[in-house]
Amino acid sequence: RSRPWLWTCMVLFQALFPQAELIIDRFHIVTQVNRALNRARIGFMNTLKKANDLKAKRDYRKLKKYWKLILKKEELLNGTEYRYHRLFKGTVTERGIIDYILSLDESLRLNYNAYQTIVFTVTHRKPDLFRSFIHEKQQGLSAKMDQALKTFRQSERAIVNALSYDYSNGLVEGINNKIKVIKRTAYGYRNFSNFRNRIFIEYKLLETKTAA
């Protein structure tokens, strides 16, 4: 199996800048386990889809509807406010919904716990906890989650740096997104120079001529 592109880039930059300390953007750390948990959820949903009983179909719909809640930070789940939810045919809290969903499948619960642990270490900058968790022997995780943790072990130093320092490529990502919006709203640019000038104008790097 080929190594992830992120690992390849890290090896390349380490060779080009041997004295530099690499830092992986925290967004990409969370994205890895986010996708792994989503894949585990969908895998379990497919199992329920093949079942013929009514309960399995109802649980399938719950897993489909509450996918965002499954990805929500556990510490932000509301456990006191009861609201009516049609799929539960009654009032239930966010915490109650998650507890029910996790009770359906042990593998999903284990993947959920792994996801939440990584999210917690990133959110609260806990490099020691992160390092300890990725080196623990984890049982019952999906292949995708196992691969994510393996990637973390390969990139351990760069991730620990990310949890120890405030550096981020968020500014660069913001610029890239704005450039994409400029291109989309203009329905593309045939002339690269015009496209470049439009970007410079947006960022006030180029003066515009006004009619006399």
Question: How would you describe each model-predicted region?
Answer:
Residues 182:
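Arg/Lys-rich, often Gly-containing low-complexity segments of ribosomal proteins
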Residues 1-164, 168, 175, 187-212:
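Catalytic center-proximal scaffold of phosphoryl-transfer enzymes
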